């Protein structure tokens, strides 16, 4: 009954999505799901928007060789998220806020957003780690580095294995002149080029900087998570006001 009451009065829903994948030996496999879940708990305290159960699995092609990683792939994730949104659309949802914890999910989420627009709705994709960079450039970080490690410390310090934090980041270069700088990125003569490789061919333990996890603190994580949650609450209030027909129309 409460769901029916909600959709008679509201058309906005919030869905979390993450992944189960390696984030280095120091971090839990569920990092990308734990962080959105924690943010949703914070948001629920200040917002009346309907929050759906988090989708814990994502598209994690390059990391799937690490033990414990669970990969749906971009196509299946697109189908799963699409079905979830279709069901909610049937009940009256028209504004979909997707709180995303994993970069590999972005292509699938974008496709669902295009589908929703064609049906008369609108989707907002909130990639928490990118948003945090805009809120404070000092928070900018890479996969399993200081930013994500700080977030997990802010949630539960016992989830970070401090014995595995120390040590330099080791990236496997493509050659003496093609230097690895990220998951797929390499640098040659000051220019970035992408050479897709499975992550075990790039990093020795699953995390990629440039920020080091040893820079993370619990205080940093708590402040970053609270700031992000507060922003999302504010954003959703503005998102509710959007004229969908005008925003998604072709007249400028």
Task: Describe each region flagged by the PLM.
Residues 1-75, 79-95, 103-252:
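Extended, histidine- and acidic-residue-enriched regions that form the cofactor-binding/catalytic faces
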